[in-house]
Amino acid sequence: MDFFMNMDPPTVTAQEHKVTMVGGRPHFYDPAPVKDARKQLTAHLLPHKPKEPFIGAVALSAVWLFPKGKRHKHGEWRVTKPDTDNLQKLLKDCMTKCGFWKDDAQVVRETVEKRWSDEPAGIYIEITDLEV
């Protein structure tokens, strides 16, 4: 399956947890921008949710297309933050929550790209069932 989510991709990542002490113990939480990014990704993913979650091994390909502005060319690699592994973690967490698969450990092969783009910006996703 493949689909395109027409959106400004989030630039905050799942690794941006905050910590506070509660009763002498550390309590980790997501700051508001991370919560907003999760909501945005989830809202764009839900219309593409498969009828049944993938079972077994899958390959995930994601192309993150960020609005290029005036300083970059269409298709140019985005070599600035956020890192691809951090972007993917947030995306896979949201895909798991939406029911694309039971556990993101099922993703055994990944391809990730970050590019600057003319409109539309967004995220192109392709999921391949490797069990077939």
Regions found by a protein language model. Give the residues of each.
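Acidic, proline/glycine-enriched N-terminal capping motif
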Residues: 1-132
